[in-house]
Amino acid sequence: MLGAIAKKIFGSSNDRRVKGYRPRVAAINALEPEMEALSDEALRARTDALKAEVAAGKSLDDILVPAFATVREAAKRVLGQRHFDVQLIGGMVLHEGGIAEMKTGEGKTLVATLATYLNALAGQGVHVVTVNDYLARRDAEWMGRVYGFLGLSTGIIVHGLDDAERKAAYACDITYGTNNEYGFDYLRDNMKYELGQMVQRGHAFAIVDEVDSILIDEARTPLIISGPIDDRSDLYVAIDALMPRLAREDYDLDEKQRTVSLTESGNEHIEELLREAGVLREGDLYDAHNITIVHHVNQALRAHTLFTRDKDYIVRNDEVVIIDEFTGRMMPGRRYSEGLHQALEAKERVTIQPENQTLASITFQNYFRLYKKLAGMTGTASTEADEFQEIYNLGVVEIPTNRPVERVDEDDEVYRTAEEKYAAIIAEIDKAHARHQPVLVGTGSIERSEHIAALLERHGYRPLDYSNLSAMEEVYAAAREGRVTKRFAVLNARFHEQEAYIVAQAGVPGAITIATNMAGRGTDIKLGGNVEMRVAQELAEVPEGPERQARVDAIRREIDENRAQVLASGEPADPEAGRKSALPGGLYIVGTERNESRRIDNQLRGRSGRQGDPGRSKFYLSLQDDLMRIFGSDRMDGMLQKLGLEQGEAIIHPWINKAIAKAQQKVEARNFDMRKNVLKYDNVMNDQRKVVFEQRREFMAQESVRETVDEMRHGVVDDVVAQHIPEDAYPEQWDVAGLREAIGAQLNLDVPVEDWAKEEGIADEEIRDRLRKAADEGYAARVERNGPDLMAYVEKQVLLQSLDHLWREHLVTLDHLRQVIGWRGIAQRDPLNEYKSEAFELFNGLIGSLREQVTGQLMRIEIMMQEPEAPSLPPMFAQHLDPVTGENEFALPQGSGSFGGGGGAFGYAAQDLSADAAVLERDPTDASTWGRVGRNEPCPCGSGKKYKHCHGRFSGEA
């Protein structure tokens, strides 16, 4: 009560913050006459003048007012658009590293030009992040005209560019691209072997469009680059065939947590089925040697119980294509990892692609925290303000609309069954269509959007192809003549290519558009239709000239008339139905279910009522909807019965709205906790990733890594001596034979250690010093023999490739550790602390292994003179998603050189350095020449077995 009174008197904290920007807005407005008086050349020269001020020591804050005034005037001249005062405030919020929440249609794209231009003057590059390639191209070309007018360069990063094109785009003052492309470029850069091959030039400032979609919805989506491993398609097919034979009591399914597990009877049943099928040949299912079968069974079970065709994925062109749960978009090329995608392929009887191993990964949370300054824009951020502040240290500022919002958001209508709900939706669409009011029907999946489409067809409606010009002419003619067309369009992942055009024309009189979640669509729905889209479609072949201009003017007049018709399409008052006032015209949003997040619902509603236009929205629900069914449908059902709800009757009541809001808040809180938990664990890996990537970059930047190589060699000597001559041990306790053998194996040295140990009064320090000297002399002779310049090149390549190989193995180990560490909680130990501790020990082990591997290789390497050529990443990648977190991955193709499958450790005589100059000579009969052999490599003895099953069994490495 007191808080509400104080808010009324003093305003909210958001109001006070917005008020704080007003003086600078006034200062920018005061400069407008001066800017208008400048010639184009003089206005363009403002950029060089402002850059000079920054170079002279002024901060960007100091030049904000003149910079914003410059951009505003340039936009007026180039685009014919003038930044409103509230847009100037939005630009200031972005510049300060905050999130500007701006309603749909308020011009977020134009707002970004202000902060982008200002920060580009510092010369460190600005990254503008969008959700798809279409928006990246559109915004770069559209706003790039303003930047180009002012003398700044604009680049675009989209899928399919080569490294040279990417490097050129990143070198521009301003770069537009998608979150995936930026993240994968970062990972790929940290797999390069020369600084000159890297494409990104740093992470100074990023503006993230649809920031909630990228930093919240996709926060649990680690970007992963992976390489292929062994093909197990036969096993997937065999196990998939058994899934339909399981009974419902064989497994426990939790839809709320999206988990499924076999019951005790289910374990017995599946074991019996596996034996019948010849898959389980020996032992019990949970014996250690059958753990792979358990993994495949679990993934097949998940594929059949948790994932639904046309909701979670579609099948197209012999592929399983994932559907983004938040936007309804197809994600071609992305794949679930850990074998889940292969299980789905087996389920759908399409070609099964090979599994993959992680080579490099990072979450969006940690990628975007690399930027020195981060900002974002969206229409819906306030519901997630706490998460933005806690995770990213980003404050949310709600920017006032330029005109008041005139949309009417009606209360939800709740029905007992889905059938009753859909009948009410069709009836409502019928009524709106008869009034020529455009309707946008929002659904949660392809399956449901196509169900609505099928119902409409049963009621006499026909689907409409928006790319068919003659079909659209029918719609436009009907609008001109005041007729109804009974046509509708469907926008879902199946019609991805037509997306922008379908959305743009959803405001035509009488239009019916059925769409999966609208988050991140990025195209405004203008009442009456979209002039630019119609001109592009109808006048594509008409050359510039009077005729074209006349037709453009005619289209504008027609759309103005259509707009007036839409504005007048509201529903009149109906006192008999209890509605005393009329409902507005404009775009009518019909929601067919509530989403798990209030933010997604708000995004759907926000498609209507842009820039002060009238509009209305209403959600139709049933107790069979996913949200209602999973989160408290029993309680809700009882509530409806108490309220006297009969079959076929809807109810509208504040209790219902509150219960739904609470259910959504529960889901949001659960998802927030999951994202925080992912971040806590990923922070452990992220700290190690930073160390490895920074060290790697240092190695590449150094002209020579000889000093590092020498230190590593000395470290190996110290480790070997410490291992065989314990501290404070008597000489007779020394393992001299073991020391000599280890020195031969790891340093390729033959030294008289036994004779040294017999010398009177000799200490372990003396032996260590002699071994260091012998190793240094042996290596110096190798350098002299092969040439110092060539050895310097080989040293760097061996160091980088060894680091990459060990880091890949380390990622796999950490992933396995993370999967099982939760069991420590049973022993009353904190799994996170246990993970941190063990990950630290593993990282120390990685450092030790790096010393051994680099030293062992270089102490044996022989050079055959060939033209050196630095290894590079293969050109083709495929993306992958984690089954639980929705992880993004890039997979390298089979047979892709040093990054492809197989190979294990560095047997790079024929593999990793074959294109360079280093060749390692291994004698099959002399194990001392083998160096470090990967556990899964073919044994160098020539037996044909893997090393771990041959000589590795005796070396202690297996």
Curated annotation (Swiss-Prot):
Compartment(s) of residence: Cell inner membrane; Cytoplasm
Chain positions recorded as ATP binding sites: Q87, G105, E106, G107, K108, T109, D524
Gene3D superfamilies assigned: 3.10.450.50, Helical scaffold and wing domains of SecA, P-loop containing nucleotide triphosphate hydrolases, SecA, preprotein cross-linking domain
InterPro entries, per database record: Helicase_ATP-bd, P-loop_NTPase, SEC_C_motif, SecA, SecA_CS, SecA_DEAD, SecA_motor_DEAD, SecA_preprotein_X-link_dom
Residues the record lists as binding Zn(2+): C939, C941, C950, H951
Keywords: ATP-binding, Cell inner membrane, Cell membrane, Cytoplasm, Membrane, Metal-binding, Nucleotide-binding, Protein transport, Translocase, Translocation, Transport, Zinc
Cofactor binding, note field: May bind 1 zinc ion per subunit.
GO cellular component: cell envelope Sec protein transport complex; cytosol; plasma membrane
One MF annotation (Gene Ontology) recorded for this entry: protein-exporting ATPase activity
GO BP: any one term: protein import
Region Disordered: start-end pairs: 598-617
Membrane topology annotation: Peripheral membrane protein
Cofactors (names): Zn(2+)
E.C. number: 7.4.2.8
Catalytic activity reported: ATP + H2O + cellular proteinSide 1 = ADP + phosphate + cellular proteinSide 2
A Pfam family it matches: SEC-C
PROSITE patterns found in the cross-reference section: SECA (PS01312), SECA_MOTOR_DEAD (PS51196)
Extent of the signal sequence: none
Function: Part of the Sec protein translocase complex. Interacts with the SecYEG preprotein conducting channel. Has a central role in coupling the hydrolysis of ATP to the transfer of proteins into and across the cell membrane, serving both as a receptor for the preprotein-SecB complex and as an ATP-driven molecular motor driving the stepwise translocation of polypeptide chains across the membrane.
NCBIfam families attached to this UniProt entry: PRK12904.1, secA
Oligomeric form and interacting partners: Monomer and homodimer. Part of the essential Sec protein translocation apparatus which comprises SecA, SecYEG and auxiliary proteins SecDF-YajC and YidC.
UniProt record similarity statement: Belongs to the SecA family.
Protein name: Protein translocase subunit SecA
Organism: Methylobacterium sp. (strain 4-46)
Gene field: secA
